From Swiss-Prot:
SUPFAM superfamilies xrefs: Translation proteins SH3-like domain (SSF50104)
Gene: rplS
Protein name: Large ribosomal subunit protein bL19
GO molecular function: structural constituent of ribosome
Alphabetized NCBIfam families for the sequence: rplS_bact
């Protein structure tokens, strides 16, 4: 193991649940406003997960008042308090970019049995 891998290993979090594209997750994000810090929940469908190690990221998409909102988070970020998996989705793709064009019930993902 080289030096970079050793440094990266120290930065990895071990409290991340197993989740993938199609899963609905609650991401509890630490938000700093002035001197105060609070936790904001971002609930949506994971549309992609990419990278590896410290650089691994995932993108969550949700509809807010008829507008699609996507947010990309680093998996091992200290700004994420915790991730909670709400439902497991049954999808056949690793990247769910096609959900961007779908609205309403068509954008719904079947739940894994």
């Amino acid at each position: 193991m080289n030096r970079l891998d050793f440094v990266d290993q120290a930065s990895l979090r071990d409290d991340i649940p197993v989740f993938g594209p199609g899963d609905t997750v609650n991401v509890h994000v630490k938000v700093i406003e002035g001197a105060k810090e609070r936790i904001q929940v971002f609930k949506g469908v994971v549309i992609r997960r990419q990278g590896g190690g410290v650089r691994e990221t995932f993108t969550v998409r949700k509809e807010s008042y008829g507008v699609g909102v996507e947010r990309t988070f680093p998996v091992h970020s200290p700004n994420i308090d915790h991730i909670q998996v709400v439902t497991r989705g049954d999808v056949r793709r690793a990247k769910l970019y096609y959900l961007r064009e779908l609205r309403g019930k068509k954008a719904k993902i079947k739940e894994k049995r």
